[in-house]
Regions:
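The conserved cystathionine-beta-synthase
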Residues: 12-30, 37-38, 77-98, 102-106, ...
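A short helix-to-beta-strand capping loop
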Residues: 7, 30-31
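Short, charged helix-to-loop "capping" segments that act as catalytic/coupling loops
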Residues: 5, 71-79, 104-117
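Structured loop/turn residues at beta-strand edges in well-structured enzyme cores
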Residues: 29, 64, 74, 95, ...
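Bateman (tandem CBS) regulatory domains
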Residues: 1-11, 64-76
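Short beta-to-alpha loop/turn elements within the nucleotide-binding domains of ABC transporters
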Residues: 1, 17, 46, 64, ...
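Short beta->alpha transition motifs characteristic of CBS
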Residues: 31, 35, 41-57, 111-135
Length: 140
């Protein structure tokens, strides 16, 4: 069973947006993580914890660029779309995180840098749904 069988829609904001925009996205979409993109390429993510730290630092979230509070892509744990759901579950447990971006990796022809294109997200809830489906005999 691949992660793409159980992924959910990611909540995404542009890197030009503010930390306040990220707060609004978190609460209106009822998620714990918002992915940050630039020209549809994943550049980071923002969690509730990141935003709480920024707010406690007496920052004005309405003017603070989301880039200043996000976890950069170089530190993000992810899964590729063709990986097994078991791999995603193991990473969630190993790194003690709530969700992973599901990505397609491409190489930029000019810079030869790896670019992550976000396909979705897989969370503990998605993995629990898979487990429940297997236990109920709805998945082999």
């Amino acid at each position: 069973i691949n992660v793409t069988d159980y992924l959910s829609q990611p909540v995404v904001i542009d890197e030009k947006m503010t930390a306040y925009d990220a707060v609004i996205a978190l609460f209106t979409e009822d998620v714990g993580t918002v992915f940050v993109t630039a020209a549809e390429i994943l550049v980071g993510l923002v969690s509730r914890k990141d935003l709480l730290k920024a707010a406690m630092g007496n920052n004005d979230l309405r003017t603070l660029p989301v880039r200043m509070v996000m976890t950069p892509v170089s530190k993000i744990i992810y899964v590729e779309g063709d990986e097994k759901a078991l791999v995603a579950a193991q990473r969630l447990l190993e790194f003690e995180i709530d969700c992973l971006p599901v990505v397609r990796i491409e190489e930029d022809e000019q810079s030869k840098k790896k670019e992550l294109h976000i396909l979705g997200r897989i969370s503990k809830t998605n993995i629990t749904r898979l487990f429940a489906d297997c236990a109920a005999g709805r998945r082999a």
